[in-house]
């Protein structure tokens, strides 16, 4: 007998908090029960009831080649046959580190972790150890994982649940976290004039992907670089989402701004749990065992994850890969903008190569305030309309969507046809 998503969700709620292992999956942001996935291939996945969906989440970013790319699967199978993990150094983690250092402009040395959250925790500790300072600056709606000091006005699932900050975070932990509006350079300059020489680091998503998709305004990242240089603090780019996606060298290559530290995740693991933090040797040598800043992990550099990530990154080096991905993203987003205008439904469409944010709003979306002003209820209706037509978007108005190389002209055309039909119903509802 075929199980249903509804039945599985009911069962899950009896043994998993909220029925899910990451809050956004619970569909709280759009209503209804989540669909439970059985298998995936290329740009599609199938739920446990056998229905096929065009996937624009891609495991929240890692599946840049689509699901089940044969070269990635072959690399994983080969490593599994050699061993799942050893708790000791391996050649494949050296290969991975060498490739990351070669591809990312701001990285000369890299330390592997098991998640993006761990990578950011390490980067913050490293910045504090390197500078001898305590304060950090982050931006509203930027999500950097669920470590205590960064769960202050965070984006992603925290916004979906209407909890921009988390219970269980002591005031003493968060009091050194200063929060500023994203894309507001004058606010940064003003804050640094007051606290600059106490600030260890400014951490930023160079493209905010956890409150939809909000690119940086011209001059914003350059301004952060200049301010950090002025006050001697560490600039961290959280490229867990943008790394290897928006360009081969990440957002720092796309925008031409080099941070002091870079955090990575998602694509670097090819779908398996991996994170990384990297930067110049001068800073990275502060990490144990060569320096006084402690970091460790039982599964860090896991060989199966390294195999998946290495195969994924090598496929990205094929000439023209990111140009094609950018072109397909533009076709999708410009096509949706045309259809929304024709339907008389106000939408703001933000996109960078391989990522997009679709907002039901009259005014351009450039920061936290304008994200929150968008119509999340209309997004929920749009989401369910597309879901019924076999198109799976992020189940939250505050998450970016992702394209893969497997999303071809046929899939994009089918998506736009479905969107056109749903937009017509939204206009009627209005």
Swiss-Prot record:
<dbReference type="InterPro" id="IPR015421">
    <property type="entry name" value="PyrdxlP-dep_Trfase_major"/>
</dbReference>
<dbReference type="InterPro" id="IPR015424">
    <property type="entry name" value="PyrdxlP-dep_Trfase"/>
</dbReference>
<dbReference type="InterPro" id="IPR049704">
    <property type="entry name" value="Aminotrans_3_PPA_site"/>
</dbReference>
<protein>
    <recommendedName>
        <fullName>Glutamate-1-semialdehyde 2,1-aminomutase</fullName>
        <ecNumber>5.4.3.8</ecNumber>
    </recommendedName>
</protein>
<keyword id="KW-0963">Cytoplasm</keyword>
<dbReference type="InterPro" id="IPR005814">
    <property type="entry name" value="Aminotrans_3"/>
</dbReference>
<keyword id="KW-0663">Pyridoxal phosphate</keyword>
<keyword id="KW-0627">Porphyrin biosynthesis</keyword>
<dbReference type="InterPro" id="IPR004639">
    <property type="entry name" value="4pyrrol_synth_GluAld_NH2Trfase"/>
</dbReference>
<comment type="pathway">
    <text>Porphyrin-containing compound metabolism; protoporphyrin-IX biosynthesis; 5-aminolevulinate from L-glutamyl-tRNA(Glu): step 2/2.</text>
</comment>
<dbReference type="GO" id="GO:0042286">
    <property type="term" value="F:glutamate-1-semialdehyde 2,1-aminomutase activity"/>
</dbReference>
<keyword id="KW-0413">Isomerase</keyword>
<comment type="subunit">
    <text>Homodimer.</text>
</comment>
<dbReference type="Pfam" id="PF00202">
    <property type="entry name" value="Aminotran_3"/>
</dbReference>
<feature type="modified residue" description="N6-(pyridoxal phosphate)lysine">
    <location>
        <position position="266"/>
    </location>
</feature>
<dbReference type="GO" id="GO:0006782">
    <property type="term" value="P:protoporphyrinogen IX biosynthetic process"/>
</dbReference>
<dbReference type="InterPro" id="IPR015422">
    <property type="entry name" value="PyrdxlP-dep_Trfase_small"/>
</dbReference>
<dbReference type="GO" id="GO:0030170">
    <property type="term" value="F:pyridoxal phosphate binding"/>
</dbReference>
<dbReference type="GO" id="GO:0008483">
    <property type="term" value="F:transaminase activity"/>
</dbReference>
<dbReference type="GO" id="GO:0005737">
    <property type="term" value="C:cytoplasm"/>
</dbReference>
<comment type="similarity">
    <text>Belongs to the class-III pyridoxal-phosphate-dependent aminotransferase family. HemL subfamily.</text>
</comment>
């Amino acid at each position: 007998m075929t199980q249903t998503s509804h039945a599985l969700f009911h069962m899950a709620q009896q043994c998993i908090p909220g029925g899910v292992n990451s809050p956004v999956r619970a569909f709280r942001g759009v209503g209804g029960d989540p669909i439970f996935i059985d298998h995936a291939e290329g740009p599609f996945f199938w739920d446990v009831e056998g229905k096929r969906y065009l996937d624009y989440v891609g495991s929240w970013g890692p599946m840049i080649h689509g699901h089940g790319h044969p070269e990635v699967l072959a690399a994983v199978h080969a490593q599994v046959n050699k061993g799942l993990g050893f708790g000791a150094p391996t050649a494949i983690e050296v290969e991975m580190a060498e490739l990351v250092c070669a591809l990312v402009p701001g990285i000369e040395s890299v330390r592997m972790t098991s998640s993006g959250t761990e990578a950011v925790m390490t980067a913050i500790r490293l910045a504090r150890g390197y500078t001898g300072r305590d304060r950090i600056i982050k931006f509203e709606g930027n999500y950097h994982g669920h470590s205590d000091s960064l769960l202050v006005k965070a984006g992603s699932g925290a916004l979906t649940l209407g909890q921009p900050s988390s219970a269980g975070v002591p005031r003493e932990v968060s009091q050194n976290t200063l929060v500023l509006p994203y894309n507001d350079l004058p606010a940064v300059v003003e804050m640094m004039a007051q606290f600059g020489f106490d600030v260890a680091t400014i951490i930023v998503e160079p493209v905010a992907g956890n409150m939809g998709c909000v690119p940086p305004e011209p001059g914003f990242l350059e301004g952060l670089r200049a301010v950090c240089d002025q006050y001697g603090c560490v600039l961290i780019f959280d490229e867990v989402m943008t790394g290897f996606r928006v360009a081969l060298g990440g957002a720092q290559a796309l925008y031409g701004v080099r941070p002091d530290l870079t955090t990575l995740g998602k694509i670097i693991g090819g779908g398996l749990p991996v994170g990384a933090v990297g930067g110049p040797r001068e800073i990275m040598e502060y990490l144990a065992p060569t320096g006084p800043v402690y970091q460790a992990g039982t599964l860090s550099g896991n060989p199966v994850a390294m195999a998946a990530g290495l195969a994924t990154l090598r496929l990205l080096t094929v000439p023209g890969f990111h140009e094609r991905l950018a072109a397909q993203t533009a076709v999708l987003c410009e096509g949706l903008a045309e259809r929304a205008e024709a339907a008389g439904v106000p939408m703001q469409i933000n996109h960078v190569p391989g990522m997009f944010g679709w907002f039901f709003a009259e005014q351009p979306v450039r920061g936290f305030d304008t994200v929150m002003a968008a119509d999340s209820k209309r997004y929920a209706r749009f989401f369910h309309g597309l879901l019924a037509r076999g198109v799976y978007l992020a189940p939250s108005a505050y998450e970016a969507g992702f394209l893969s190389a497997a999303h071809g002209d046929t899939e994009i055309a089918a998506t736009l046809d479905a969107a056109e039909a749903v937009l017509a119903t939204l206009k009627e509802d209005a």
